[in-house]
């Protein structure tokens, strides 16, 4: 306010200072109030409401999501995990579980390769665009499981400089026509020293009678005289004593009828040679050559 002309300068100055001091106090009080409100707001924002984590609306969805994730992981690891080769098969499969796959090649009368298709058609193999089974050798390289049929020994084809055994080609051709391109189930017993999985293999075929009946491939070969019962004392796998007796009975019946490799057995017993005897003889002949491994 304006002071009268007769007022002294000292009174005017005192009043001005008093007014200025009051303004400063009001501003300080307002600033303090604002700061306090800001701190209260920040505290409310950053504070953790621990009680909310114990409420049912929080616990139930969390349990459902966690259980679903763990369940999906377990199912994938146990049922949908694909093995690219025999070396990758975990020990939990040996003598307990099986592999489902499609036969991509047949190397001999008692071994072949499958492309592992866990879950089969139910998991999309063969009809989903991203689950097609490769067909070319380049695509299949390092992606197939090498299977050795359990319980049998088929005649040897010519390889590693060794001559072909009688009925080796017939056994190979039959196994190729019986399995190539088909889905098989292999019950894994163990791995062998050649990075193969020794397995009892079963297949279902439309043209068999009765159709789609599960067939034991090893048994079918023994019955037709295309293989002998595995004779090695170490490393023999049959899938149990009952299967061993069944295989020996099938071999005895084929020998009695003189079918397949048993055709000339009675007339020429002294020169007849089983696959086991053939490999033993070849091994003895190659004993002088270091680094040569005898195939089992």
Swiss-Prot record:
Start-end of Polar residues biased regions: 8-18
Broad EC category: hydrolase
One MF term in the entry's GO annotations: metal ion binding
EC number(s) stated in the UniProt entry for this protein: 3.1.-.-
Primary localization class, coarse: mitochondrion
Sequence intervals crossing the membrane: 59-75
Cellular component terms (Gene Ontology): membrane; mitochondrion
Pfam family for this entry, one: SNase
Keywords of this entry: Calcium, Endonuclease, Hydrolase, Membrane, Metal-binding, Mitochondrion, Nuclease, Transmembrane, Transmembrane helix
Keyword Plastid tagged: no
Family of this protein: Belongs to the LCL3 family.
PROSITE patterns: TNASE_3
Topology class, membrane: Single-pass membrane protein
Domain TNase-like: 97-264
Protein name as catalogued: Probable endonuclease lcl3
PANTHER family linked: EBNA2 BINDING PROTEIN P100, SERINE_THREONINE-PROTEIN KINASE 31
Catalytic residue positions: 148, 156, 196
Subcellular location, record wording: Mitochondrion; Membrane
Species name: Aspergillus fumigatus (strain ATCC MYA-4609 / CBS 101355 / FGSC A1100 / Af293)
């Amino acid at each position: 306010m304006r002071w009268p002309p007769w007022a002294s300068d000292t009174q005017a100055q005192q009043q001005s200072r008093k007014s200025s001091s009051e303004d400063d106090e009001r501003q300080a009080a307002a600033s303090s109030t604002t700061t306090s409100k800001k701190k209260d707001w920040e505290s409310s924002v950053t504070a953790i409401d621990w009680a909310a984590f114990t409420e049912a609306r929080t616990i139930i969805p969390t349990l459902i999501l966690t259980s679903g994730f763990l369940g999906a992981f377990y199912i994938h690891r146990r049922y949908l995990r694909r093995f690219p080769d025999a070396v990758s098969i975990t020990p939990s499969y040996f003598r307990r579980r099986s592999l489902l796959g499609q036969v991509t090649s047949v190397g001999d009368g008692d071994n072949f390769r499958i492309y592992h298709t866990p879950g089969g058609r139910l998991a999309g193999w063969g009809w989903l665009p991203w689950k097609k089974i490769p067909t070319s050798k380049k695509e299949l390289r390092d992606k197939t499981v090498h299977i050795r049929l359990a319980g049998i020994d088929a005649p040897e084809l010519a390889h590693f400089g060794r001559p072909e055994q009688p009925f080796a080609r017939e056994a190979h051709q039959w196994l190729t026509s019986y399995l190539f391109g088909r889905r098989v189930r292999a019950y894994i017993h163990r791995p062998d020293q050649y990075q193969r999985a020794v397995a009892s293999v079963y297949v279902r075929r439309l043209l068999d009678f009765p159709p789609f009946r599960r067939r034991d491939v090893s048994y079918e070969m023994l019955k037709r005289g295309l293989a002998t019962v595995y004779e090695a004392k170490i490393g023999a796998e049959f899938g149990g004593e009952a299967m061993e007796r069944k295989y020996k009975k099938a071999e005895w019946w084929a020998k009695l009828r003189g079918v397949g490799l048993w055709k000339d057995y009675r007339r020429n017993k002294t020169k007849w040679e089983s696959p086991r005897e053939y490999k033993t003889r070849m091994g003895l002949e190659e004993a002088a050559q270091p680094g040569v491994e005898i195939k089992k």
